Design a protein with these regions (language model features):
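Tandem repeat scaffolds
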Residues: 2-156
Length: 156
């Protein structure tokens, strides 16, 4: 499924069901609500979009997630996430508020390249804490602006 050049009020699990790949390209998206969607089996690709409200607490992107050249306006709370069989790629995007990764277990690689985190992220922060993120296949972090090793738990 490809949605291109659209204004989308809300995208949730019901919209993604039955698709192996779901692409959002050049869209204005008010809300992506995937809170508590364990084992999301779609490869979600978001490119050149503006997202007002990205809600992904407890979402497992089993078949991968790609966010490229996208602006995310809200604070993102990604707890108990990861569990990805395919890579999670975040590239060339701008996050206007804090992006909190909390107790995520990444089974495949996560890539952060050429992003701007205006208020930072704790992806590789919280060292030694019981809720520190884990990376079974490692991570690739390159050329990001903003602190990526914040040692904070909540949304700043």
């Amino acid at each position: 499924m490809v949605k291109e050049n659209q204004n989308i009020d809300i995208l949730n699990q019901d919209d993604l069901n039955g698709h192996s790949t779901y692409q959002l390209i050049d869209c204005f998206i008010n809300t992506i609500d995937l809170v508590g969607v364990f084992e999301l089996n779609v490869n979600l690709i978001i490119e050149n979009c503006i997202i007002n409200n990205l809600q992904i607490h407890s979402c497992w992107f089993v078949n991968g997630l790609s966010v490229k050249n996208t602006i995310v306006k809200n604070s993102v709370d990604y707890q108990m996430g990861g569990h990805n069989i395919k890579p999670i790629i975040i590239e060339g995007s701008i996050f206007k508020s804090f992006f909190s990764f909390f107790d995520c277990q990444f089974e495949n690689v996560i890539e952060l390249k050429n992003n701007i985190f205006e208020k930072g992220t704790n992806l590789i922060g919280n060292k030694g804490e019981g809720f520190e993120n884990s990376f079974a296949a490692g991570f690739l972090i390159d050329n990001n602006i903003g602190k990526i090793d914040v040692s904070e738990v909540g949304i700043l």
